[in-house]
């Protein structure tokens, strides 16, 4: 991780990789491995305006139950759709945000405040499936980082299925 701000980055890059193996004790035939990863780029355009590009994916091997497949949808990877809207053996997504972020100082709170416009797309794959269907969502929102200790955003997303308002909280531990 090499970013200028760990809560609301304006420049830098972050890599996230995870592997998990699950073996069901009462049924040895139900075991699977789950692999996920993403890369986040934060590209400054002009002062206070940056582009955030997040590309990631996940896949599962073995014999998982359907509810253990990777998901697509919601505030984490495909805004404009409800959370976990799509499931598949393999998932790929790309999230793009244009951000305007400025410092905020007041008697009540110091931190950062900003506006965001986004365009997300993603796809799931299942064995013996040939849809070629990519799902897209777009929208706008506001973000707030009170005292620079946590990151909240509220977005209004639009897709061909729904128009959800989504709230996210991110905090570094």
List where the protein language model places each region.
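C-terminal outer-membrane beta-barrel translocator/porin domains of Gram-negative envelope proteins
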Residues: 1-108
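Transmembrane beta-strand segments that form the barrel wall of outer-membrane beta-barrel proteins
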Residues: 13-25, 79-84, 115-125, 150-160
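Residue-level detector of the transmembrane beta-barrel scaffold of outer-membrane proteins
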Residues: 14-16, 50-54, 95, 114-118, ...
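Solvent-exposed loop/turn segments connecting transmembrane beta-strands
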Residues: 23-31, 86-90, 127-133, 156-168
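Outer-membrane beta-barrel transmembrane domain signature
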Residues: 46-48, 89-106, 114-139
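Hydrophobic alpha-helical segments
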Residues: 99, 103, 124, 145-149, ...
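Internal helix-turn-beta structural module
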Residues: 134, 138-150
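Outer-membrane beta-barrel "beta-signal"
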Residues: 142-144, 162-173
